[in-house]
Amino acid sequence: MASSLSFGSRFLIALIRGYQLVISPLLGPRCRFNPTCSQYGIEALRRFGVIKGCWLTVKRVLKCHPLHEGGDDPVPPVKNNDNREH
């Protein structure tokens, strides 16, 4: 599946994976959502490509704070394949 992703999507996914491996263990579990914001970002980038995937991820991270109740918040389904970058 990775071969069908754009360079930008693969690069951003690698950055998120780096965060998951290096920074996240130092901070401990903080995300209020399921899936976690980093996993959400990876799925959004895979599903929608760089532009929409980044937009969805930024919106999600901005909601992840103590005043928001959190809970289940999956990546929305793809309505058609025209939104996907190749």
Curated annotation (Swiss-Prot):
It is a peripheral membrane protein. GO terms for cellular component: plasma membrane. It comes from the Bacteria. Keywords: Cell inner membrane, Cell membrane, Membrane. Could be involved in insertion of integral membrane proteins into the membrane. Belongs to the UPF0161 family. This is Putative membrane protein insertion efficiency factor. The lineage of its organism: Bacteria, Pseudomonadati, Pseudomonadota, Gammaproteobacteria, Enterobacterales.
